[in-house]
């Protein structure tokens, strides 16, 4: 017998929690370094097949800022707020919701629970929050983003359980600074004086003793790159104690290998990117539970705006006009979740109240005739080889994604065939680590992956701001973390109107007005940028054995491990 749960998220409110960029590179990535080792089942552990295996554990760094890293490390590092599946905030370390204490200057005060402590029994205090803030703002540290933190002019520790943040101006999404999985509070007493860029790459531990350290229900017991990460209960956790003996994450980065490992009992749980026919495969496994919901992850087609050809906005508009997004939805994601549909917004998901179909200016089914007319008017002439050319530049581009992801590979094929009809040649060029190397090194031309949205789009400002264009560095250098950069504007687009609207949204406290501002941002992106074309809102797909109970998917960046302390496990032997 199997059990299936198909759900559509409850409606998001206009102003709520953040999706830090973990979101960003996070859910976007499908495959990390592929392991040659076959996963081995452990009857005393829950074994999870991980599509994206973390290269490092420090989730604040660009190299570690992936959703799988967040789902693995997140249960070890508590945050001010826990982000719930309905996208509401629940105070976690905080004893209550942080409060606005003054409008001029804009000041927010937060109070900690008095019983919060680290796994070594040292109290977790406001000094740890201050240390985390200082670490993020230290220009020597490679952090994924400083957005929001850079609006704080003073961070005042009032007492061990109280701190105060004074902002340059009104900053509406202040909760977001302490709610994302990339904002787990850091232990000052073990990390002070350490090299942040290296200290937690291979362990979440006290660097002096190598003893695991944490403040959440689990601890990271061990990490073997490309092989496994093991997390175990934190015996000194101040909240509800976890009862699972341990959870072992192993890399299973190929779509077919993942379901085969699940069917063979080599792994007990999988949380794959959407794959064609995967729902039926999971449901066919005896004793399996399948769950799917429409989360904040959204698939998109990106064009690097500095590439010759793509530097012409008319070319980008023609491609947006031709893209058969409805066909992609029908063939790639519809069987995973019946509620899947074309996404016409980069700031809000389809079931969020502020959602407006701003990208419907481009027909969902794709219009080849209209796209050809745009290119004709822009002077791009069709050559004898069927490829358009202008001033010696051919409209011939590579299109990459994470190799081994059959759903994305099908999307590529659909796009390739359609764009051929408008004189645009697409050559597919994939790699397992394309996001961690090629994309961040700007060694790509076009690409398909997914960002993670949020109830309040502030968390993804770094995708759109011109000041969030990272330093261009060599792919090999990027992979090992030797680039001094932050931000995620990987299409290198500059749109001053977007910058102005985002700055205005940050200081607007009225949720209705903020929602309107972000829709204005989206309309600018759809008409005057056109580098990131939304395809669809991704359904989550979670499969697990019915020997595990208490599992509840969380479509935020926290993922399915968000309530790991509620899991129970009936060992198989």
Predicted regions and their residues:
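Ligand-site clamp/hinge motif
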Residues: 113, 206, 233-281, 413-416, ...
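Surface-exposed binding/hinge segments that line
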Residues: 146-197
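Long beta-strand-rich cores associated with HINT superfamily self-processing modules
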Residues: 542-573
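Structural transition elements
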Residues: 218, 340-384, 403-410
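N-terminal lobe/hinge region of extracytoplasmic solute-binding protein
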Residues: 49-103, 134, 213-214
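Extracytoplasmic/peripheral linker and loop segments enriched in polar/acidic and small residues
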Residues: 39, 329, 364, 373, ...
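Ligand/substrate-recognition segments at binding pockets and active sites
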Residues: 225, 380-454, 511, 537-540
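Gly/Pro-rich hinge or "lid" segments in bacterial periplasmic/extracellular proteins
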Residues: 74, 85-88, 182-242, 368-369, ...
């Amino acid at each position: 017998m199997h059990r299936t749960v198909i759900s559509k998220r409850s409606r998001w409110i206009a102003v709520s929690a953040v999706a830090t960029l973990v979101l960003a590179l996070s859910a976007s990535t499908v495959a990390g370094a592929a392991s040659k080792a076959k996963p081995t089942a452990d009857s005393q552990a829950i074994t999870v097949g991980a599509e994206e295996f973390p290269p490092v554990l420090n989730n604040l760094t660009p190299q570690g800022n992936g959703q799988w890293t967040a789902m693995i490390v997140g249960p070890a590092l508590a945050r001010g707020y826990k982000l719930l599946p309905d996208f509401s905030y629940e105070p976690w370390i905080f004893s209550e919701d942080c409060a606005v204490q003054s409008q001029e200057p804009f000041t927010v005060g937060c109070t900690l629970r008095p019983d919060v402590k680290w796994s070594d029994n040292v109290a977790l205090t406001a000094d740890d929050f201050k240390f985390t803030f200082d670490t993020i703002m230290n220009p020597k540290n490679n952090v994924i983003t400083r957005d929001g933190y850079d609006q704080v002019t003073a961070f005042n520790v009032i007492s061990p359980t109280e701190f105060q943040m004074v902002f340059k101006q009104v900053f509406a999404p202040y909760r977001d600074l302490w709610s994302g999985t990339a904002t787990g509070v850091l232990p000052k007493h073990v990390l002070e004086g350490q090299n942040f860029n290296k200290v937690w790459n291979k362990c979440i531990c006290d660097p002096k003793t190598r003893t695991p350290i944490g403040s959440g229900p689990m601890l990271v017991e061990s990490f073997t790159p490309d092989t496994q990460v093991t997390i175990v209960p934190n015996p000194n956790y101040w909240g509800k104690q976890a009862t699972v003996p341990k959870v072992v994450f192993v890399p299973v980065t190929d779509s077919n290998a993942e379901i085969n490992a699940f069917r063979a009992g080599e792994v007990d749980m999988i949380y794959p990117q959407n794959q064609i026919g995967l729902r039926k495969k999971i449901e066919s496994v005896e004793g399996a539970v399948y769950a799917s919901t429409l989360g904040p992850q959204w698939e998109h087609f990106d064009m690097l705006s500095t590439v010759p050809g793509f530097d012409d906005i008319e070319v980008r508009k023609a491609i947006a006009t031709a893209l058969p997004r409805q066909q992609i939805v029908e063939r790639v994601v519809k069987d995973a979740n019946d509620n899947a549909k074309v996404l016409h917004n980069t700031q809000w998901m389809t079931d969020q109240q502020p959602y407006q179909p701003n990208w419907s200016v481009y027909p969902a089914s794709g219009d080849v005739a209209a796209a050809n007319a745009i290119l004709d008017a822009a002077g791009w002439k069709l050559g004898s080889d069927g490829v358009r050319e202008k001033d010696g530049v051919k409209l011939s581009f590579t299109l990459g994604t994470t190799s081994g992801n059959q759903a994305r590979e099908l999307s590529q094929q659909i796009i390739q065939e359609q764009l051929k009809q408008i004189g645009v040649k697409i050559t597919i060029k994939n790699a397992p680590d394309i996001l961690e190397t090629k994309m961040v090194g700007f060694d790509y031309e076009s690409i398909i992956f997914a960002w993670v949205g949020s109830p309040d789009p502030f968390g993804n400002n770094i995708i759109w701001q011109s000041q969030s264009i990272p330093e261009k560095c060599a792919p090999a250098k990027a992979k090992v973390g030797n680039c001094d950069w932050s931000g995620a504007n990987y299409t290198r687009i500059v749109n001053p109107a977007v910058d102005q609207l985002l700055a205005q949204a940050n200081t607007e406290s009225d949720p209705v007005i903020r929602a309107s501002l972000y829709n204005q941002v989206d309309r600018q992106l759809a008409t005057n940028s056109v580098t990131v074309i939304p395809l669809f809102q991704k359904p989550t797909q979670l499969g697990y054995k019915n020997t595990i109970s208490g599992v509840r998917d969380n479509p935020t960046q926290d993922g399915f491990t968000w309530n790991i302390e509620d899991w129970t496990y009936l060992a198989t032997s």
